[in-house]
Amino acid sequence: MYVGRLDKVIKHKQYGIVIIEHKSTSAYAKASGFRSDYISSWSPNSQIDGYLHAGHMLFGDKVSGIWIDAALVHKTVHNKFRFIPIDRQFEQLDVWLHETRDWIQRIEDEKSQADRSPYGGYAKNTGSCNMYGGCAYRDICKFVAKPSDREADFSGYRVSKWEPFSILKLEQLKLEPEK
């Protein structure tokens, strides 16, 4: 079962069904408004490929693609918006599905290995601790050797289990999550 949320789905007179994904960026370029690396970051992109896969599951061959509805957020430029059209061949979506299943299997294998390890937990990727504004768990890693051995909450952190099936109320549809 694949769970997610599409920002918007439209029926276009010329293009049929189009999935709209709203995005904002501060990646500014004087010449065009949007930096070229931002424009190209959507292809390939696992999130977008997943939405397109879901779109084809829901609407079949009526889906013509995804349009990234990009808005530039900048201190002096307030009028830069752009649609970035994205499409994939079915073979590319098949590869996305294979790779996604591979990542799921890797995570399950890592969890099994972590459960058996005397050190507990997953292996850390310490080269990424400061990327994207920094990891939210950096302080725990700095001061606690084996977080998995601790039952109590860490100061400043809240334990919250993400349960999308509860949010979607699948029991009302008489569906159950896959085991």
Where are these predicted regions, by residue range?
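Non-catalytic protein-protein interaction segments used by genome-maintenance enzymes to assemble
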Residues: M1-I48
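Metal-dependent nuclease catalytic regions and adjoining charged, substrate-binding loops involved
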Residues: S32, S40-S43, G50-K179
